[in-house]
């Protein structure tokens, strides 16, 4: 049985083996493999059609699974920051975890390795690794900045400052704190567009893009696809499902928002795939899709999913199957 860390490590080693020293010219590099790693936030394996869900609509990710590899057993940490540190360094948290929202600046990440191998590098989405000092003031600013982790370009939420992540967000864009004030500005779409622009600019050279998504972390919000819907989108069959009896009726729209966020996350993955096709680099680009931990749990802010006739309560934060089992899909034509 292969886990995510072993798989990513083997992919990285295989990719590096195909590369020549960075000092050689682009012509000498020849045919290269681009890599895009997408990691969703708070979506357990049970929220994807390719894992058997009929409740969630994820056609673009399902297609990647159908035409690529779907791993049935992939396990993360039960919380986001430990997972982010682990996947970026390839090390168990017992070896290099410092504290919440801190990535040890002495650690070498896959961004550093890909840049050293001659790749253009980009990251967009959620950072939260510099050290905000919320829980440990003495560690504020003691973590790692994206440029020090090997990324040439970035569009990130929570680098040095917080702010909104969804509607009218505030992001660090290549080191400059930027507010997106247009009423239609939606953070995940901005980050996806940033990655697509990066792909466009680097179509003729090896590139690596890491997309630690903000979707579908709380707060549950409407998306550009669902924002214009009139009234709460409540499925009456779902309200009275036995698995939902512990939830009051006022909470059901939040469940629907989560489902809509999963669908929109899938749409954004599809946008990246379409961009690769558009610029003619899909055939030599490896796409990896995974998650940082299980779906949200708890009596308020938690979700319940149906999978193969079984009700699964979100297990984020727990060292259980529901808290640590995530999707892993690899696709390269």
PLM region spans:
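Formylglycine-dependent sulfatase
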Residues: 2-333
């Amino acid at each position: 049985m292969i886990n995510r860390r072993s798989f990513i490590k083997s992919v990285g080693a295989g990719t590096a083996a195909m590369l020549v020293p960075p000092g050689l010219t682009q012509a000498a590099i020849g045919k290269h493999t681009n890599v895009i790693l997408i990691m969703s936030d708070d979506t357990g394996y049970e929220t994807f059609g390719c894992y058997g869900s009929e409740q969630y609509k994820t056609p673009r990710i399902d297609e990647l699974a159908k035409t690529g590899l779907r791993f049935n057993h992939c396990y993360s940490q039960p919380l986001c920051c430990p997972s982010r540190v682990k996947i970026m360094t390839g090390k168990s948290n017992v070896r290099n975890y410092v504290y919440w929202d801190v990535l040890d600046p002495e650690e070498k990440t896959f961004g550093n390795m890909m840049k050293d191998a001659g790749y253009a590098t980009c990251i967009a989405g959620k950072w939260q690794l510099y050290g905000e000092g919320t829980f440990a003031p003495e560690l504020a600013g003691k973590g790692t900045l994206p440029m020090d982790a090997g990324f040439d370009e970035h569009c990130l939420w929570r680098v040095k400052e917080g702010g909104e992540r969804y509607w009218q967000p505030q992001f660090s864009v290549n080191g400059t704190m930027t507010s997106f004030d247009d009423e239609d500005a939606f953070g995940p779409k901005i980050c996806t567009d940033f990655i697509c622009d990066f792909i466009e600019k680097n179509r003729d050279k090896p590139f690596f893009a890491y997309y630690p998504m903000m979707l579908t972390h709380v707060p549950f919000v409407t998306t550009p696809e669902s924002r214009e819907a009139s009234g709460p989108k409540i499925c009456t069959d779902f309200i009275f499902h036995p698995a939902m009896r512990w939830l009051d009726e006022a909470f059901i729209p939040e469940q629907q928002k989560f489902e809509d966020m999963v669908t929109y996350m899938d749409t954004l993955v599809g946008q990246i795939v379409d961009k690769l096709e558009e610029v003619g680099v899909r055939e030599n680009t490896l796409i990896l899709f995974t998650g940082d931990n299980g779906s949200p749990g708890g009596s308020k802010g938690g979700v319940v999913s149906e999978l193969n006739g079984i009700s699964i309560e979100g297990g984020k934060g727990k060292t259980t199957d529901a808290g640590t089992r995530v999707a892993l899909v690899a696709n390269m034509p």
